[in-house]
Amino acid sequence: MSMNDPLSDMIARIKNAAQRKRSKVSTPASKLRARVLDVLADEGYIRGYSLVEKPGAFPEFEIELKYFDGEPVIAEISRVSKPGRRVYSSIKDLKPIKNGLGISILSTPKGVMSDTAARDANVGGEVLCRVY
């Protein structure tokens, strides 16, 4: 089965694992997923991730989810820009998520970064997802 939107698949896996209170979740590896996971780790939404390579299988990322008082740190994660409807935002159109408690993850000409990093770099781009 082919996967039309790998990033949406990763987001769904993270959501489902957090709802089931799993400590780890795995997802197929890709460069875009690695960059999004880097942003999530830097912002403190996940503990980290590691690349797992098994002989004869595709490489996977094993993501360690983060919890606080038994509740997932990621309360909500949603895909914004989809293959059928791309969403782009300029620097002045980037609004804070949940009064600054959440982040947007953008794909910019300078790489994948959070909305605060994009404001600091004065660059806009495609809004991949929102996390809070």
Curated annotation (Swiss-Prot):
Keywords linked to the UniProt accession: Ribonucleoprotein, Ribosomal protein, RNA-binding, rRNA-binding
Keyword rRNA-binding part of the UniProt annotation: yes
Top-rank taxon: Bacteria
A GO cellular component annotation in the UniProt record: ribosome
Gene3D superfamilies: 3.30.1370.30, 3.30.1490.10
Protein's UniProt keywords contain Lyase: no
One annotated GO biological process: translation
Entries under InterPro entries matching the protein: Ribosomal_uS8 (IPR000630), Ribosomal_uS8_CS (IPR047863), Ribosomal_uS8_sf (IPR035987)
Molecular-function annotations in GO: rRNA binding; structural constituent of ribosome
Pfam family, any one: Ribosomal_S8
HAMAP family (alphabetical): Ribosomal_uS8_B
General function of this protein: One of the primary rRNA binding proteins, it binds directly to 16S rRNA central domain where it helps coordinate assembly of the platform of the 30S subunit.
Complex formation: Part of the 30S ribosomal subunit. Contacts proteins S5 and S12.
Sequence similarity: Belongs to the universal ribosomal protein uS8 family.
Protein name per its UniProtKB record: Small ribosomal subunit protein uS8
Species for this entry: Caulobacter vibrioides (strain NA1000 / CB15N) (Caulobacter crescentus)
